[in-house]
Amino acid sequence: MTQQRTLKNTIRATGVGLHSGDKVYMTLRPAPVDHGVVFRRVDLEPVVEVPADAELVTETTLCTGLTCNGAKIQTVEHLMSALAGLGVDNVIVELSSAELPIMDGSSGPFVFLLQSAGIVEQSKPKRFIRITQTVEVRDGDKVARFEPYEGYKLGFTIEFNHPMIPAKQSRQEIEFSTSAYVKEISRARTFGFMRDLEYMRERNLGLGGSMDNAIVLDEFRVLNEDGLRYTNEFVRHKILDAIGDLYLAGGAILGAYEGFKSGHALNNKLVRALLADQAAWEWVSFPEGTEQPPVTYASPVYA
């Protein structure tokens, strides 16, 4: 039996937007069953709600952004990843600005926030999206693919011509569970290259970026004094992003995901292609008295 989950208590955090550089106040609130993840722009009059829905994705350049009724919500992927990692189905995310706080560039601070708020089970079974047929999307040599699988498995390969990202550290696989997510993925930070800084600044991107919330590389090395948290932190962060992007499908995935040089755009294209092909997936749940789901979530955290 696996039930839907929400937060036990309301919790707040403050930070800056990675791309906007704006200070943002964020409040996470419990939500009822079947509510899903919904963002709320409380700085707008009237308040605008933006559901966490792959069909509402309008921005995929260096982040995943949603637009609904003229209101934007940007850089949702790290919080969505933490929610997926801890199995939280229903939550209201109130924001005082258009962009979520970047925190330390990983999903670790969001995991801590969610655990601090407490996670409780609700009265209805959790709904999973089970992959029943292979779905693949491409963009040049980039590939993202779903395949049927008993569980949730993610594999990712990156290719960067950089001495700090050798081929042997460019591949990672994870058999998804809450404990594997928290230990192996959640602390991996976003990263960027000094050579891309001018491109980003011209587009008003990365204005809140610093070595406090990203790994920064020049042509030869990592510039952060403390170095890396994992030897292959870069590809682990790509899995962190993918878990968040895929959670915009509207339910927890049961299947195998494979990404080769994929990013936010291709991940979103994959989710849209999946949802458009009704023969490729089905809703499943595991109510009391039935089989256990092939994915392990941590026991609820009662704060």
From Swiss-Prot:
Positions of disulphide bridges: none
UniProt-listed GO biological process terms: lipid A biosynthetic process
Keyword RNA-binding applies: no
Record-listed E.C. numbers: 3.5.1.108
Pathway in which the depicted protein is active: Glycolipid biosynthesis; lipid IV(A) biosynthesis; lipid IV(A) from (3R)-3-hydroxytetradecanoyl-[acyl-carrier-protein] and UDP-N-acetyl-alpha-D-glucosamine: step 2/6
Catalysed transformations (reactions): a UDP-3-O-[(3R)-3-hydroxyacyl]-N-acetyl-alpha-D-glucosamine + H2O = a UDP-3-O-[(3R)-3-hydroxyacyl]-alpha-D-glucosamine + acetate
GO cellular component terms listed in the entry, alphabetical order: membrane
Keywords from the named record: Hydrolase, Lipid A biosynthesis, Lipid biosynthesis, Lipid metabolism, Metal-binding, Zinc
Family listed: Belongs to the LpxC family.
Protein name in the entry: UDP-3-O-acyl-N-acetylglucosamine deacetylase
Organism per entry: Xanthomonas axonopodis pv. citri (strain 306)
Gene of this entry: lpxC
